[in-house]
């Protein structure tokens, strides 16, 4: 959220601290402080582990799927949002969207297979983009002398983590 957005201006206490206990700025610390880091000094991160914050945020997402015929969400920066948010959102969708309609949720997480697969379950997301395979595909198709066996190895590795039954997104 931008610092000028009414949500932040009306609720600055909803943001995570910009400064860490050691006095350093908590910006762009994608892995060390992935749930609290700010994307920049003007882009506060909301404390989505706090029910006072995640309840209205999940209600906002629910509004879109209950008032419009969307069939899914693409969630950016999945790893920067705690599991309690994803579980709450998915529960609300399942409780409030007709049984005749399935809402597909795909996440975007750069990271290890363990991190990516941690968000795929019946209580959270349906799928994730598999950037590990994407990077291997780009190398295979766009560079010289990269064997298809490298891409095949990444695909097999991914199946080992996510299962053959999971639909993993590959950005093309």
What are these regions (language model features)?
Residues 1-68, 88-98, 114-116:
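Substrate-binding/active-site clefts of carbohydrate-active enzymes
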Residues 2-8, 60-62, 66, 71-170:
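Active-site-proximal helices and loops of the catalytic beta/alpha 8
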């Amino acid at each position: 959220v931008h610092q000028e957005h009414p949500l932040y201006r009306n609720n600055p206490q909803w943001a995570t601290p910009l400064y860490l206990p050691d006095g350093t700025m908590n910006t762009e610390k994608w892995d060390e402080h992935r749930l609290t880091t700010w994307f920049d000094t003007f882009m506060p991160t909301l404390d989505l582990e706090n029910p006072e914050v995640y309840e209205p945020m999940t209600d906002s997402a629910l509004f879109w799927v209950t008032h419009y015929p969307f069939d899914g969400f693409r969630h950016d920066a999945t790893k920067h949002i705690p599991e309690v948010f994803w579980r709450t959102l998915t529960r609300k969708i399942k409780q409030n969207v007709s049984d005749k309609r399935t809402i597909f949720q795909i996440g975007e997480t750069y990271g290890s297979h363990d991190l990516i697969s941690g968000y795929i379950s019946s209580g959270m997301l349906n799928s994730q983009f598999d950037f590990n395979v994407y990077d291997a595909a780009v190398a295979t198709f766009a560079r010289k002398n990269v064997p298809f066996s490298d891409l095949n190895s990444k695909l097999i590795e991914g199946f080992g983590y996510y299962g053959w039954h999971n639909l993993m997104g590959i950005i093309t």
